[in-house]
Curated annotation (Swiss-Prot):
Function: Zinc transporter that may be involved in zinc uptake from the rhizosphere.
Disulfide bonds: none
Region (Disordered): 185-222
Sequence intervals crossing the membrane: 47-67, 80-100, 120-140, 228-248, 262-282, 292-312, 324-344, 364-384
Gene Ontology molecular function: zinc ion transmembrane transporter activity
Extracellular side: 26-46, 101-119, 249-261, 313-323
Family matches, as Pfam families: Zip (PF02535)
Organism, scientific name: Oryza sativa subsp. japonica (Rice)
UniProt keywords, alphabetically: Cell membrane, Ion transport, Membrane, Signal, Transmembrane, Transmembrane helix, Transport, Zinc, Zinc transport
Protein name in UniProt: Zinc transporter 7
GO biological process, one term: zinc ion transmembrane transport
Cytoplasmic compartment spans: 68-79, 141-227, 283-291, 345-363
Length: 384
């Protein structure tokens, strides 16, 4: 027991030492905008950012949902496939170029002690762990929804079989009246039960068939709709987690020079992330209310983060050791989730899953769109 207490004290001491403030006067000056601090102008720009990012998110996530019945925006159209590939490139670049870089910047800050934060590559390790955790979550969620789908299929089959059995039983109870003539030429009714022989096909078309829910695959096959449900929910989780961080970072800034380029960059980023998420929601065929809730939750997350950041900007110290550690770890987690989702559930699923095996032209367009999306989002790192 004594050793355990000593171990806890030692761990607490190491944690306190790891969060001790380092020498970071230059970092604080840089965060303040190097002479570009203006609280009033920054607050106005935050209002503009909230409105612009909200509109971009609503339009981005709403286009695939509103266009489900329009030929040009259906989920199997060439335009939709190319746009979704572009959005996948944007999300991939967000994870690698933006979130992972921000995590490295936060956890290597001189405001943090060199040990342990600069003695081990925490950003890459945490991102890898988050990607593996997302894989496990993806697997478990797919198994859960697959089980629900299979149970629903069995329920429909059982109901159809019961209806067919009831129909056959009612037919067996029907008696048919026939008329025979006796030797005295007198006609007499004869009641004969009308029964079906179950050893050969039924001759009457009752219209009862064993129905299956739409989108069910073969035995052991995961239906595409089940995968789309899982992908859309995990993708939203990853997007929302880093949207909160981005919103808070912008909200606590007091420098118009820092905020101004972020408005355009985040609007672009929000639009195409929304388009990818909206496409996944459309493919999952959620009910209208569920789709609307998911879309609204995505659209308001970044503006809400900006508002929260603006509210605490007067006393929040973004360069405090605790703030840097939390920001760095959350950025790393978000990077891992986004990298996994973009590579596995968006790019590999569409490019290697057989959806684009028909048209060479469509394949070329999708690859060009993917590379352009990644390049465009990467180039925004110059300003934001």
């Amino acid at each position: 027991m004594e050793r355990f207490v000593q171990f806890l004290r030692r761990g607490n001491g190491l944690m306190a030492a790891s969060l001790a403030a380092g020498s970071c006067a230059e970092e604080v000056a840089k965060a303040e905008g190097a002479g570009c601090r203006d609280d009033a102008a920054a607050l106005r720009l935050k209002g503009v950012a909230m409105a612009t990012i909200l509109v971009a998110g609503v339009v981005g996530v709403g286009l695939p949902l509103a266009g489900r019945k329009r030929r040009a925006l259906r989920t199997d159209s060439a335009a939709f496939v190319a746009a979704k590939a572009f959005a996948a490139g944007v999300i991939l670049a967000t994870g690698f170029v933006h979130m992972l870089h921000d995590a490295e910047h936060a956890l290597s800050s001189p405001c943090l002690p060199a040990h342990p934060w600069r003695s081990f590559p925490f950003p890459g390790f945490v991102a890898m762990s988050a990607a593996l955790a997302t894989l496990v979550l993806d697997f478990l969620a797919t198994r859960f929804y697959e089980g629900k789908h299979r149970a629903e299929t069995e329920r429909v089959k059982a109901a159809a079989a019961a209806a067919l059995a009831a129909s056959s039983a009612s037919d067996d109870d029907i008696t048919v009246v026939t008329v025979t003539e006796d030797d005295n030429d007198n006609k007499a009714p004869l009641l004969q039960p009308h029964s079906h022989s179950h050893s050969h096909p039924h001759g009457h078309g009752h219209g009862h068939e064993l129905a299956q829910p739409e989108g069910s695959g073969g035995e052991g096959e995961v239906p595409a709709q089940v995968r789309s449900v899982v992908v859309s929910q995990i993708l939203e989780m990853g997007i929302v987690s880093h949207s909160v961080i981005i919103g808070l970072s912008l909200g606590v800034s007091r420098s118009p020079c820092t905020i101004r380029p972020l408005v355009a960059a985040l609007s672009f980023h929000q639009f195409f992330e929304g388009f990818a998420l909206g496409g996944c929601i459309a493919q999952a065929q959620f009910k209208t209310l569920s789709a609307a809730i998911m879309a609204c939750f995505f659209a308001i997350t970044t503006p809400a983060g900006i508002a929260a950041g603006a509210g605490v900007a007067s006393f929040y110290n973004a360069n405090s050791p605790r703030a840097l550690v939390v920001e760095g770890i959350l950025d790393s987690v978000s990077a891992g989730i986004l990298i996994y989702m973009s590579l596995v559930d968006l790019i590999a699923a569409d490019f290697l899953g057989g959806k684009m095996t028909g048209s060479t032209r469509q394949q070329v367009m999708a690859y060009i769109a993917l590379f352009l999306g990644a390049l465009s989002m990467s180039s925004l790192a110059i300003w934001a």
